[in-house]
Design a protein with these regions (language model features):
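Aromatic-glycine hotspot motif
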Residues: 1-143
Length: 143
């Protein structure tokens, strides 16, 4: 694991993409195949993956509890970033399972396509970051 928090987060994000790619390549049928991994508890791939999900939840709780007990409270910006990341994961999760054809269909008659919605979110975020950078550059420095 990386030595710094930022590097560890980047490593976790990179692994998230690798895991997502691997699982998207697998079929639903494969979920019922036997797994030799100890965490599958002698069962199938479904059990292995759901145990991995539960395992992550357990350790997330461990970290949150340790931070609480140690009074390591996130700053407003850190909390904002963590909540934004949760929502980004929900957005990505809502797109998983759509075919490319479905991705380019309207979400409802006369409404934006799924692709346009995703692009809109991305464009708005990029515009917000540009505005933040411009605003920071035009503020008088404190010092």
């Amino acid at each position: 694991m990386a030595a710094t928090v930022r590097e560890a987060i980047r490593e976790l994000m990179t692994q998230t993409m690798a895991t997502m790619d691997a699982l998207l390549e697998a079929s639903d049928r494969e979920l019922t195949t036997a797994s030799s991994h100890a965490c599958a508890q002698g069962k199938d791939l479904w059990t292995l993956i759901t145990n991995d999900i539960d395992h992550e939840k357990i350790h997330t709780g461990q970290i949150l509890e340790a931070r609480y007990e140690s009074r390591i409270t996130a700053s407003r910006m850190q909390r904002l970033l963590a909540e934004w990341l949760e929502e980004r994961a929900r957005l990505i999760g809502s797109l998983i399972g759509l075919t490319d054809e479905q991705f380019n269909r309207e979400t409802a008659p006369g409404e934006w396509t799924y692709r346009v919605v995703a692009k809109h979110v991305l464009t708005l975020e990029q515009d917000s970051l540009k505005t933040i950078a411009v605003d920071q550059a035009t503020r008088p420095s404190h010092g």
